Swiss-Prot record:
Protein name (record): Uncharacterized protein YFR016C
GO cellular component: cellular bud; cellular bud neck; cellular bud tip; cytoplasm
Organism: Saccharomyces cerevisiae (strain ATCC 204508 / S288c)
Ranges of Basic residues composition bias in the record: 72-83, 183-199
Biased segments, Basic and acidic residues type: 250-280, 287-300, 349-370, 379-408, 484-497, 508-527, 594-622, 631-672, 684-711, 753-783, 910-920, 935-948, 986-999, 1062-1071, 1118-1127
Domain of life the protein comes from: Eukaryota
Biased segments, Acidic residues type: 466-478, 855-868
Residue numbers of Phosphoserine PTMs: 180, 462, 523, 975, 1037, 1046
Length: 1233
């Protein structure tokens, strides 16, 4: 067994990089490289020396030179014939390899008959180089490829005589394969390189990877020479190559993947006796084995194709980095292209075997080495290219057919299997036709087109095609292609899902093909109207799932099964720049007639949308349309609406004309305002088709999903049953949308307002003379009578629904305006409702009066004067009845009121309110308890209107008559005085609140003061009255009026201090600022007095600086001052004296605490010494008492630290250093307590 050529860590490296070749010429190369026998190698493996190895290397280099010379000569010969492999066997040359033994003797190996191998592949070129390491200092080269040559030898022939002394060859042989030459390091000489033709890989895409070919070439050459020794041998040579491929970074755009894998090739190379029998078999085995290894790489690399790099078909066939391509390149490219027709990859073995069966003889002649893939003969090249074109045309037709499918029918028995779960897209046939016009590779250009289609929001549809069914597909397609008319619902579905309606621009493909409504509808819709992208992909996805084609209806192409259109449309006139938008509920049913496979009978099936969906949709539409409806109702009160077909853009077929009652969907032409188009996402009619059996349900079922309709949407409904040329248009605007939404509330049914507004219902008409000429097959299809009848009923109900809320919206507007104007009124009414004595008639009067006040903001001065005078007279009459007051006293009371009340109107109002509410509890202390100030202020703030005055005055008289039967009038005077005291601050608050008519009220007050000022006699009477009131307060003290008494005592001063209180109330910051400073000073003074510490350190410093005489006098004076002070005052000098007597300790732990303890302790000692502070050390490791003190008072501080006295902790090392930096260490130690 021959396994390697390495001797004592020295490696024999064979490196074949690429060399270019020109033309399609093939060269023959006879190689005779004798190899020693197994026995000789095993016997002499320990005797191989360095010189022997040098000779072996020289022989190899000579062999390489011969190869290069033959390679150059082969370029000049030009093209050879295909049977060249048989001719070159007669022109074999003998190569003699001399191996020197340890003694230095040279033996010549006998020549043998060689089996020639075709080195006819021009794509790859192998450069063989040898390298030997003789110095121990040099590191061996890494060996990525290990070659194990196993020879099963049945004969006993040796290589040559005297091979006992042949130096042995060790087992492991390193053969390094690369694309660039490697220089030799032996004796600083450049290595000799030779070029020989390589073999192409069976992988059609990997044309530059030469590792496997070069290795096999180098091994097979040696095996050929070994087999030439004895032609009668019956032996099989097994070459086992364990390859670890290096990272291969290709320059080609198609392959960018790095791979490193271990691959094993078992190659059976027979001798010349049985080469004719086994060559074909070995080639097939090698091709299939290598195909298995290289297929995963091919699949992954094909996906990395960039569109910009896709060039012509010839460019893709040529291997990158080489000069020219050949038949093998074209054949391999074809395999790659055929692979793109499948979804999960291409079975390489199966197709390879087909090629082998088809051209086994040509492969045997042209590809004897067994490494390259099967190469077809030139006469079969045109046939294969024609087959390629057939595959391309077949693919174009299939893609065209795929894009016209309505939906993905998983139960269809057609040859195409649509995989909608993955990333699918509909490839337009023109783009693929452009792809193959350039004859580019299938996977390269097709993938780029699919990527181009992704910008339209569609998903790629991967089509799985089996080659066995290609003929059946073509026949089936030709039979059904011209008949089936389908809508591109998949494109619409994906367009709605991706929030866009994209129009596909296409030209007519052929006479037998019809461009269906999906794409052309989109293009015409883009020309006629501006389209807003519809949001809500979830709803469209749900609808599309149920929108499969009813195949049983396809078998009966009756009028009922013909394409139907359900029209729900309201025509809106030209609004004045309102945000009026139109949605078109396109409900289309196009049923293919040629579908053969039918499902269950679903004829009467009807998909109903949920009521919440309809309610939300109705609300959203009503929001946009309520205001324009109300405006139109005001202008045109007849209550009828004009429904016209002005925007109709297509021509009705004969079937649609017969069914004149059919309904058509139109796209209104309003370029000024944006539009929202709701498109049907499938051809299945269950979700939106109207059934004749349930005409009552139609009004609820035919709706646009709420998720696809924006809130700014108004609908237009058309009906073709009646003709009313004088019908009016209903205008739906956006200003009353919110009002209508509030009025409608949670009403979701479409017929909620139908019965109430029957006189206002629409007369829905169809004007056939306005229909323009367009093909309905391309646009919207044909309509049936049943759908039109049912849609008319639903449209009438929907139109009635939109009319009714308008009347209520008008009413609601007036109510809202009243509410906005009476916002303050309602708040006041709510406050008044909380009062105990407020009844319903009174509340009604208050509301009426507030309305009057808001309407007439300016009140005449005369009316104000009359009201004030009437209030005063009524108040005087009440007192006259109760206490029999005389006329002079009435004059005094009147003068007093005029003087005290600055704001006459509000004062009179609040005075009587306060009098009522405070007098009643004042007279009934036994029942209700005490009348607190909080209750009085609350009631005073709530009663501020004029309407309450009359009611309160009447109640005053009644209450006083009932309650104060046995009491004196003085009690009433007390309550009057009480109310005066509380009245002024409350009136000021009311003045701030009431800003309307304030200027006029002030004028009225001034006029009243001028006219009603009393004489001096009246003023004296008022003062006398006040004195009497004070006496009466003392008499009534038993009535338990604590708060009332305290307020009444302060009453005489309220007149004088009223404005002062108001000024302080207006400017509280100024008054409080001074107080704050005073408070701060007072607090600091109190704090110092509590401490009773006097800082006399400065005085002591001065004493030391003065002379002795001066110091004595000052000390005496200071001592006198100190004697004058209290004895409990402590000075800082005393504190210092006491602290200086205490010892200072440095607490440390010399035995523990880490390596920082000693330097920190030394730092503390240095600081204390510099500040002239005596100290001593205390070791916590040995002093238990010090340890207890530190644990108790340190609070987690780290050692070392400074402690004064027994347990007065000054600080640890950090705090001491900070104090030292601030020059406060002595103060910290001695001046602190």
């Amino acid at each position: 067994m021959v396994e390697s050529l390495t001797v004592e860590n020295q490696e024999h490296n064979v490196q074949p990089p690429s060399v270019t070749s020109a033309g399609d010429s093939y060269s023959t190369l006879a190689t005779d490289l004798p190899l020693p026998s197994t026995n000789d190698i095993i016997e002499s493996r320990d005797q191989l020396t360095e010189s022997d190895l040098d000779e072996a290397i020289n022989a190899t280099e000579n062999f390489a030179q011969e190869l290069s010379s033959q390679r150059k000569s082969s370029k000049l010969k030009g093209h050879k014939k295909k049977n060249q492999g048989q001719i070159k066997a007669n022109r074999d040359r003998d190569t003699i390899v001399k191996l020197s033994s340890s003694v230095g003797e040279t033996e010549e190996a006998s020549t043998r008959d060689a089996i020639s191998h075709d080195l006819e592949r021009k794509d790859d070129v192998i450069e063989i180089a040898t390298d030997t390491i003789n110095d121990a200092t040099e590191s061996p080269t890494q060996i990525p490829i290990d070659v194990n040559v196993v020879i099963k030898e049945t004969s006993t022939n040796n290589v040559a005589e005297g091979t006992e002394n042949v130096p042995p060859i060790k087992e492991s042989t390193g053969i390094e394969v690369g694309n660039s030459p490697i220089t030799r390091r032996k004796k600083n000489k450049k290595k000799k390189t030779t070029n020989r033709r390589g073999r192409n890989s069976s992988n059609p895409a990997d044309t530059t990877d030469l590792s496997k070919q070069s290795t096999l070439d180098s091994i097979l050459v040696g095996i050929e020479e070994y087999l030439q020794e004895d032609g009668s041998k019956n032996e099989d040579i097994k070459v086992n190559i364990v390859q670890d491929e290096p990272v291969n970074v290709e320059k080609m755009d198609i392959r960018t993947r790095n791979e490193s894998s271990d691959k094993t090739f078992d190659i059976d190379v027979p001798n010349k006796d049985n080469v004719d029998e086994t060559s074909s078999k070995s080639e097939n085995n090698i091709n299939e084995e290598k195909a298995e290894h290289t297929l995963p790489r091919e699949e992954n690399e094909i996906l990395n194709v960039n569109e910009g790099n896709a060039a012509s078909f010839k460019h893709q066939l040529e291997p990158h980095g080489l000069e020219a391509g050949d038949e093998n390149g074209q054949a391999s490219t074809k395999d790659v292209e055929s692979e793109s027709l499948t979804k999960n990859g291409f079975n390489f073995k199966e197709n390879e075997s087909k090629h082998l069966k088809a051209g086994e003889k040509q492969q045997t002649e042209s590809d004897r080495d067994g490494i390259s893939p099967s190469v077809l003969a030139k006469n079969q090249k045109e046939t294969e290219i024609g087959k390629e074109d057939h595959v391309f045309e077949q693919k174009d037709k299939e893609d065209e057919k795929c894009r016209k499918e309505l939906s993905v029918n998983h139960e269809n028995n057609m040859s195409h299997n649509f995989n909608a779960a993955g990333s699918d897209s509909i490839i337009p046939p023109e783009t693929e036709r452009e792809t193959y016009d350039d004859e580019t590779m299938g996977p390269t250009k097709r993938i780029s087109d699919n990527e181009k289609n992704l910008q339209h929001g569609t998903n790629d549809i991967s089509v799985e095609v089996e080659k066995e069914e290609e003929e059946e597909e073509e026949e089936e397609e030709n039979s059904t292609f011209s008949k089936v008319k389908k809508e591109n619902v998949t494109g619409e579905q994906e367009a709605v899902r991706n929030n866009e309606v994209s129009g596909t621009e296409e030209e007519s493909t052929s006479k037998g093909e019809e461009i269906m409504g999906g794409d052309e509808k989109q293009s015409e819709a883009g020309e006629k109207s501006s389209i807003i992208e519809i949001e809500g992909s979830a709803n469209s996805a749900k609808i599309s799932k149920d929108n499969l084609v009813l195949e049983d209806e396809a078998e009966a192409p009756t009028q009922e099964n013909k394409p139907t259109e359900v029209v729900g449309e309201i025509d809106i006139p030209d609004a004045p720049r309102d945000d009026v938008e139109i949605v078109e509920a396109v409900e289309k049913n196009i049923i293919p007639e040629d579908l053969e496979v039918a499902k269950e009978d679903q004829e009467g099936e009807q998909v109903k949308l949920d009521e919440p969906v309809k309610a939300m949709k109705d609300d959203k539409i009503a929001m946009r349309g309520a205001e324009s409806i109300s405006e139109d109702m005001k202008k045109k009160q007849e209550g009828t609406a004009e429904l016209s077909n002005e925007k109709a853009k297509k021509e009705v077929d004969e079937t649609a004309r017969e069914s004149a009652e059919g309904v058509e969907v139109e796209k209104s032409k309003t370029p000024e305002s944006p539009k929202v188009v709701k498109r049907c996402t499938s051809g299945r009619p269950e979700d939106l088709q109207i059934n004749e059996r349930d005409p009552e349900v139609l009004k609820e079922d035919v709706r646009v999903p709420d998720e696809d309709v924006k809130p700014e949407i108004a609908t237009t409904i058309e009906n073709s049953e009646e003709e009313d040329p004088k019908s009016q248009r209903v205008q739906i605007s956006t200003e009353q949308a919110e009002t209508t939404q509030k009025d409608m509330g949670d009403v979701g049914s479409t017929t909620s307002f139908k019965e109430e507004e029957k006189p206002k219902r629409f007369e829905i008409t169809q004007e056939g003379d306005k229909i323009t000429g367009k093909d309905t097959n391309h646009e919207h299809g044909e309509a049936t009578e049943a759908a039109s009848e049912n849609s008319k009923a639903s449209d009438v109900g929907t139109a009635e629904k939109y009319i009714e809320p308008s009347s209520e919206s008008v009413k609601k507007d007036t109510e809202e305006d009243a509410e906005v104007e009476n916002s303050e009124k309602t708040e006041f009414i709510k406050v008044k409702a909380e009062l105990e004595n407020l009844d319903a008639p009174k509340e009604a009067e208050v509301t009426a009066e507030l309305n009057k006040e808001n309407e007439d903001v300016e009140v005449d001065t005369e009316e104000d004067a009359e009201v004030e005078n009437s209030e005063k007279t009524e108040f005087i009459k009440v007192k006259a009845e109760l206490g029999n007051l005389d006329a002079p006293k009435e004059a005094e009371v009147t003068a007093e009121l005029n003087k005290e009340n600055e704001d006459v109107e509000v004062a009179a109002t609040s005075k009587e309110d306060i009098e009522t509410k405070c007098s009643e509890p004042a007279e009934t202390p036994i029942e209700d308890g005490t009348c607190t100030e909080a209750e009085v202020s609350k009631k005073d703030a709530e009663a501020v209107t004029k309407e309450d005055e009359n009611m309160e005055n009447s109640k005053i008289a009644e209450a006083l008559k009932d309650v104060t039967g046995d009491q004196e009038i003085d009690d009433i005077n007390i309550s009057d005085e009480f109310q005066r005291t509380v009245e002024l601050p409350e009136l000021e608050k009311q003045d701030i609140k009431d800003n309307k008519g304030e200027d006029k009220e002030l004028e009225v007050e001034e006029t009243e003061k001028e006219t009603s000022l009393p004489d001096l006699v009246v003023e004296e009477n008022i003062t006398e009255e006040k004195n009497e009131i004070k006496q009466e307060e003392e008499e009534v003290s038993q009535l338990d009026f604590n708060e009332t008494e305290s307020i009444s005592k302060e009453a005489p001063n309220n007149d004088e201090n009223g404005f002062e209180d108001q000024s302080t109330r207006e400017n509280p910051k100024k008054a409080s600022a001074d107080d704050i400073f005073k408070d701060i000073l007072d607090e600091t003074n109190e704090f110092l007095e509590q401490l009773k510490i006097v800082d006399d350190s400065e005085l002591n410093a001065l004493l030391q600086s003065l002379d002795a005489k001066d110091s004595t006098t000052q000390t005496t004076e200071q001592s006198k001052k100190n004697n004058d002070k209290p004895q409990d005052v402590i000075t800082t000098s005393e504190i210092r004296k006491l602290n200086e007597k205490e010892p200072v300790y440095i607490y440390t732990s010399l035995a523990g605490g880490g390596f920082h303890m000693i330097p920190r302790t030394n730092r503390l000692s240095t600081i204390l010494t510099a500040n002239r502070i005596p100290f001593t050390y205390r070791d916590l490791g040995t002093d238990d008492e010090a340890r207890k003190v530190w644990k108790t008072f340190s609070k987690g501080r780290s050692l070392p630290g400074v402690v004064r006295g027994h347990n007065d902790l000054i600080g640890n090392w950090e705090e001491i250093e900070e104090a030292n930096e601030d020059y406060k260490l002595r103060e910290l130690i001695y001046d602190t307590i």
